[in-house]
UniProtKB/Swiss-Prot annotation:
The L3 protein is a component of the large subunit of cytoplasmic ribosomes. It comes from Oryza sativa subsp. japonica (Rice). GO terms for biological process: translation. Gene3D superfamilies: 3.30.1430.10, Ribosomal protein L3, domain 3, Translation factors. GO terms for molecular function: RNA binding; structural constituent of ribosome. GO terms for cellular component: cytosolic large ribosomal subunit. Pfam families: Ribosomal_L3 (PF00297). Residues 18-31 have a biased composition (Basic residues). Its main location: cytoplasm. The keyword Flavoprotein does not apply. The keyword Ribonucleoprotein applies. It is found in: Cytoplasm. This is Large ribosomal subunit protein uL3.
Length: 389
């Protein structure tokens, strides 16, 4: 490394190999927060859809810092989170070889949007999914069998999770009709309490504010924006070769020694970039907006302008946010409309940054398509006045 003054071991992290397309479109929760029996039963994760980004102005609460009581401007992401519907329970047993599925119980009525998930082509299918299972609830023998399955869970299970799905029909920005289905772990209380808690919410909605609170630190799991097949300079960040290099300069000149007579996995190579499964830790919830309530609006204690959270002209490539939403500090994985999994933090947050109370002064709702100057349509009309017809 003759051109460097200091050491630089390599370009690009090897911790995320292989850099290949994710096998799943929705982020998978590979580990849930640690269970605490002393706490009441609660769900540990949720599913949302990325709408877009805007920025806010707030006052910093950091005694002793030069920024204390000063205004700061920060980027935020809006994630639309319509209520989930619980349609099942699944129990797991801890074994020496890891978790093993014990049994599962489903609700009687499953909507069309979740039954679509069990077919590749809904239009050409016979649409028979769960028709036999639903008949169990109509007979005494079937009801008895379901109760026996629940009792079996209470007796043998180590972990209980609910099966929940999104209400994608409420999403105005998405054309997809197939709901996203996932397992969500129930933490708190005894196993019997967890089974009763999950069974109690069969075919009922769970809003986002039942899982997360304002100022909470959460993790976001999702699949990044896909970039396709790209070269080594973009994919790994290696240095471009000098201008006079023969046969291209956006390359790795030496891909290894003669022996061992193979290319090492540590050498930067061209290939797939993006559409990788990633987990982002410690994203702070700045605001929870509830549909049909004042919290859904973008007005604050300092800015009483009547305006909705959706910017003028809608979020580019998404549209209007009509349902519940979360406002998260910073960015988040994936493009617009991408489904993201939201999980409670695995660690107990003790830092001053995590415990800081957020008081928003201003939420920007100017157009995100171009250089937005106005916060509302009325403001724009007042500025321009009556235009010639």
């Amino acid at each position: 490394m003759s051109h460097r003054k200091f050491e630089h071991p390599r370009h690009g992290s090897l911790g995320f190999l292989p850099r290949k397309r994710s096998s799943r479109h929705r982020g998978k929760v590979k580990s849930f927060p640690k269970d605490d029996v002393s706490k009441p039963c609660h769900l540990t994760s949720f599913v949302g859809y990325k709408a877009g980004m805007t920025h806010i102005v707030r006052e910093v609460e950091k005694p002793g810092s030069k920024l204390h009581k000063k205004e700061t401007c920060e980027a935020v992401t809006i994630i639309e989170t319509p209520p989930l519907v619980i349609v099942g329970l699944v129990a797991y047993v801890k074994t020496p070889r890891g978790l093993r599925s014990l049994n599962s119980v489903w609700a009687q009525h499953l909507s069309e949007e979740v039954r679509r998930r069990f077919y590749k082509n809904w239009c050409k299918s016979k649409k028979k999914a769960f028709t036999k299972y639903a008949l169990k609830y109509d007979s005494d023998a079937g009801k008895k069998e379901i109760q026996m399955q629940l009792e079996k869970m209470k007796k043998y299970a180590s972990i209980v999770r609910v099966i929940a799905h999104t209400q994608i029909r409420k999403m105005k920005g998405l054309k997809q009709k197939k709901a996203h289905l996932m397992e969500i772990q129930i933490n708190g209380g005894t196993i019997a309490d967890k089974v009763d808690y999950g069974y109690k919410f069969f075919e009922k909605e769970i809003p986002v504010d039942a899982v997360f609170q304002k100022d909470e630190m959460i993790d976001i799991i999702g699949v990044t924006k896909g970039k396709g097949y790209e070269g080594v300079v973009t994919r790994w960040g290696v240095t471009r070769l000098p201008r006079k290099t023969h046969r291209g300069l956006r390359k790795v000149a030496c891909i290894g020694a003669w022996h061992p007579a193979r290319v090492s996995y540590t050498v930067a190579r061209a290939g797939q970039n993006g559409y990788h499964h990633r987990t982002e830790m410690n994203k702070k919830v700045y605001k929870i907006g509830k549909s049909g309530q004042e919290s859904h609006a973008a007005c604050t204690e300092f800015d009483r302008t009547e305006k909705d959270i959706t910017p003028m002209g809608g979020f580019p490539h998404y549209g209007v946010v009509k349902g519940d939403y979360l406002m998260i500090k910073g960015c988040c994985v994936g493009p617009k409309k991408r489904v993201v999994t939201l999980r409670q933090s695995l660690l107990k947050q003790t830092s001053r940054l995590a415990l800081e109370e957020i008081k928003l002064k201003f939420i920007d709702t100017s157009s995100k398509f171009g250089h937005g100057r106005f916060q509302t349509t009325d403001e724009k009309q007042r500025f321009f006045g009556k235009l010639k017809a």
